[in-house]
Amino acid sequence: MKVFILALLALTATTAIAQLETTCSQGFGQSQQQQQPGQRQLLEQMKPCVAFLQQKCSPLRMPFLQTQVEQLSSCQIVQYQCCQQLAQIPERTRCHAIHIVVEAIIQQQSQQQWQEPQQQAQHKSMRMLLENLSLMCNIYVPVQCQQQQQMGQQPQQQQLQEQLTPCATFLQHQCSPVTVPFPQIPVDQPTSCQNVQHQCCRQLSQIPEQFRCQAIHNVAEAIRQQQPQQQWQGMYQPQQPAQHESIRMSLQALRSMCNIYIPVQCPAPTAYNIPMVATCTSGAC
């Protein structure tokens, strides 16, 4: 019976993808012919992600299946295939693959929806896709993509702050439990805290050692800017002991949480304090 169910699901998934191939290929037109072979291969591999993100899927009823776990929809099947394909792509190529997905979706949208400059639209779409795919698939996707840098160079400080946004989110405990869309997979129920903590450590490990101090300072600045202004009255005067102590504690927390080297001597660049919060223990907030 299990073999029959698996075969049926595979047949259903293949049928769903076959129905989507025509729509995807027609949306690109002649632009596909100008793409390099590697790009065409990535686009073919990422078709389930294009279909899912455009919500080109409809509920699929299978009344002859008895258990609730087996009551799948075509959306769930395409979502699973998207995550499976993305996991098979090497990390260094995922940015490029997602960029191809963005271009495919933009080309299929009507021009009326893109009144703003095309580069800004692509930049926003890229950021949204990175966040959605990273959380949906519970997989690492680099925040700083080379394709993003081609769309518009940002100052180095802003790049570091954007790259360590997961660290700021984690340190402020702005996370809540999430559920796994496929309960039949024997994995623990992860929390968004664990996902964000993993992203924070991965991003921090990719930053060269000589820039990590500045990156942590940018995280502190991001946290400070998100706090109500009344909480910071009187904190803009130089308070060197408090600054160094707060930064030292923040560095120590990230150092132990990520098990990564961060220079002990990390001077404070500006005269502000860092609001301290307790870190999560064993990935639980």
Swiss-Prot record:
Gene3D superfamilies: Plant lipid-transfer and hydrophobic proteins. GO terms for molecular function: nutrient reservoir activity. Contains disulfide bonds. The keyword Disulfide bond applies. Residues 1-18 form the signal peptide. Keywords: Disulfide bond, Seed storage protein, Signal, Storage protein. The keyword Membrane does not apply. It holds the Pfam family Gliadin. It comes from the Eukaryota. Seed storage protein. Might be integrated via inter-chain disulfide bonds within the glutenin polymer. Belongs to the prolamin family. This is Avenin-like b2. It comes from Triticum aestivum (Wheat).
